[in-house]
C-alpha cells in the first residue's frame, strides 16, 4: 500500500506540513493506544531531542494517549537509544522518540519502539497507517479513565550507566584527548557525562542547544567544526553524534573522517578477537563499501546486507543470530546491549580499543582500503524521477557498464525528497562513468538540468 505517514525511519517531515503536524501526532497516539493497549491502563514512554517543535509534538502525543486512558511518561530530552532502553525496562506498551535525527530544526519526526525496544517492522507500520486514518472517529476513554502525564527523572543517568557498564574495568582513559561534538542535540548532556566519568581529557562542542541550532554546522553530517577542534586541541580522536545521538562519525588525529564502515570493521575485528562476535560476521546495508566485505573475508567473517535503514539491519540480526550491525552513515547496533543504533555506545567501544592498544587513531581506524565509491543526492519535487522510462533505461545501462566489477544502488530517500545514486567499483574511472550516466538521467527527470 502507498504510505501517507511512514518512511524509512518512522514519520518525518517539515513541521506543520503533512505528514509532520500536531494532528499526525494526535492520530498516531490514538491509533497506537487502540492497537497496542486497547484496554487502557498502560504507560507509554516519550522522549524528544532539542528542536523547538518538540514540545508541540509531545503535547499532541500526550493529548492522544491520555484521551485513551494511557499514561504518558515524559523522559524529557534524551537520546533515541535511551527511549528504546526505557521502553523495554519499564514494561511500557510503547516508546516514542520525537526527533528528525540529523535533519535541521525545521523538520521533526516520530520514531516508535515496541515493549522490547525494537523499531516496528513494515507490517506493524502499515497497520498503524490504517488505524491513523480513522483515529479521530472511534471511541475514547470514559471521563474517569482519562489519565495524567507524569515525568520520569533519571533516564539520562540510567542510560549513561548502561553504556559505561559495557567497558572492561581497570582501563585508563586519562591520557586520551577527546573532542565530542553533540550537534546541539539530544546527547548534549549524556555524551559529556559519560566521557567525563571515564576520565578522558575532554573538549565538548555543539552542546548549547537553543531549539533552532540542532545539527546546524555541528554533528555527524557537518564535521568541519569537529575536525578543526581536533587539530586545534591536539586531540587523539573526535566523535560526532547526530541530533538524536543514535549514530556517530569519528575523526582521527589528522582531521580525517572515518565513517560507519570503518568503525564497524574495527569493532567487528575486536569482538572477533575477544570471542564476543556472534553469527560469524556482521550485518550492514547495501550502501556499505565492498572494501568492508573484503576485509571481513580476510578475518574469516561474513557480511550480510539489507536494504537501507537500521531497523532492517536489526531485523536481520535478530533473525540470524548476529550481535553487530549498522550503516555506513554511523548507526551501529551492538545488540548484546542495545536494540537500536547508539552513537555514544559505539563511541565508547572505539575509545576502549584506542586506550587498550595505544598508537594513533589514524592507524586504528584505517581498517580497510575502501573501494572507490561515490554518492550523489538529487533533490526533486513532484513525481518520483525513478518512475521515468528514460531513467529506468539509463540505470540499466549504468549497471551494464559495471557488470560484475562493481555495484550501483539507486533509491528514493525515506526521510527527504531526494534520490540517492551510489556507485562503487575497484576501477574508479569505470565507477565515475556509470555514476554520472545514472545521475544525469535522474537529474534531468527531476527537472534540475
Swiss-Prot record:
Cofactor: binding details: Binds 1 Mg(2+) ion per subunit.
Keyword Protease found: no
Keyword Metal-binding set for record: yes
Any Pfam family the entry gives: PGM_PMM_IV
Cellular compartments per GO CC: cytosol
Enzyme's top EC category: isomerase
Modification note: Activated by phosphorylation.
Function: Catalyzes the conversion of glucosamine-6-phosphate to glucosamine-1-phosphate.
Name this polypeptide is given: Phosphoglucosamine mutase
Amino acid at each position: 500500500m502507498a504510505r501517507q505517514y511512514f518512511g524509512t525511519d518512522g514519520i518525518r517531515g517539515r513541521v506543520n506540513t503533512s505528514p509532520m503536524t500536531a494532528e499526525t501526532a494526535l492520530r498516531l497516539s490514538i491509533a497506537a493506544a487502540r492497537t497496542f493497549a486497547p484496554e487502557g491502563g498502560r504507560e507509554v514512554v516519550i522522549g524528544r531531542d532539542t528542536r523547538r517543535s518538540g514540545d508541540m509534538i509531545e503535547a499532541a502525543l500526550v493529548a492522544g494517549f491520555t484521551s485513551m486512558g494511557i499514561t504518558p511518561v515524559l523522559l524529557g530530552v534524551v537520546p533515541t537509544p535511551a527511549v528504546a532502553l526505557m521502553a523495554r525496562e519499564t514494561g511500557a506498551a510503547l516508546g516514542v522518540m520525537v526527533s528528525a535525527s540529523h535533519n535541521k530544526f525545521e523538520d521533526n519526526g516520530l520514531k516508535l519502539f515496541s515493549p522490547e525496544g525494537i523499531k516496528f517492522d513494515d507490517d506493524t507500520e502499515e497497520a498503524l497507517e490504517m488505524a491513523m486514518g480513522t483515529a479521530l472517529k472511534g471511541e475514547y476513554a470514559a471521563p474517569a479513565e482519562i489519565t495524567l502525564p507524569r515525568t520520569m527523572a533519571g533516564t539520562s543517568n540510567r542510560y549513561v550507566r548502561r553504556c559505561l557498564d559495557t567497558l572492561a574495568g581497570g582501563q585508563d582513559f586519562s591520557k586520551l584527548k577527546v573532542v565530542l561534538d553533540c550537534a546541539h542535540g539530544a546527547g548534549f548532556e549524556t555524551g559529556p557525562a559519560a566521557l567525563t566519568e571515564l576520565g578522558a581529557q575532554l573538549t565538548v562542542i555543539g552542546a548549547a542547544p537553543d531549539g533552532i541550532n540542532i545539527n546546524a554546522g555541528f554533528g555527524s553530517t557537518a564535521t568541519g567544526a569537529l575536525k578543526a577542534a581536533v587539530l586545534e586541541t591536539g586531540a587523539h580522536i573526535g566523535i560526532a553524534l547526530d541530533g538524536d545521538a543514535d549514530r556517530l562519525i569519528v575523526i582521527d588525529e589528522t582531521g580525517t573522517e572515518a565513517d560507519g564502515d570503518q568503525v564497524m570493521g574495527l569493532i567487528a575485528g575486536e569482538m572477533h578477537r575477544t570471542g564476543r562476535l556472534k553469527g560469524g560476521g556482521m550485518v550492514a546495508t547495501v550502501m556499505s563499501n565492498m572494501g568492508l566485505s573484503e576485509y571481513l573475508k580476510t578475518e574469516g567473517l561474513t557480511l550480510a546486507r539489507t536494504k537501507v535503514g537500521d531497523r532492517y539491519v536489526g531485523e536481520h540480526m535478530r533473525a540470524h543470530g548476529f550481535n553487530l550491525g549498522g550503516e555506513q552513515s554511523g548507526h551501529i547496533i551492538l545488540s548484546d546491549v542495545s536494540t537500536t543504533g547508539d552513537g555514544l555506545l559505539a563511541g565508547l567501544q572505539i575509545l576502549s580499543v584506542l586506550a587498550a592498544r595505544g598508537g594513533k587513531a589514524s592507524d586504528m581506524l584505517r581498517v580497510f582500503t575502501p573501494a572507490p565509491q561515490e554518492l550523489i543526492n538529487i533533490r526533486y519535487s513532484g513525481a518520483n524521477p525513478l518512475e521515468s522510462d528514460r531513467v529506468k533505461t539509463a540505470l540499466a545501462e549504468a549497471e551494464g557498464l559495471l557488470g560484475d566489477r562493481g555495484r550501483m544502488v539507486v533509491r528514493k530517500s525515506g526521510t527527504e525528497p531526494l534520490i540517492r545514486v551510489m556507485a562503487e567499483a575497484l576501477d574508479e574511472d569505470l565507477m565515475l562513468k556509470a555514476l554520472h550516466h545514472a545521475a544525469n538521467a535522474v537529474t534531468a527527470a527531476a527537472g534540475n538540468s
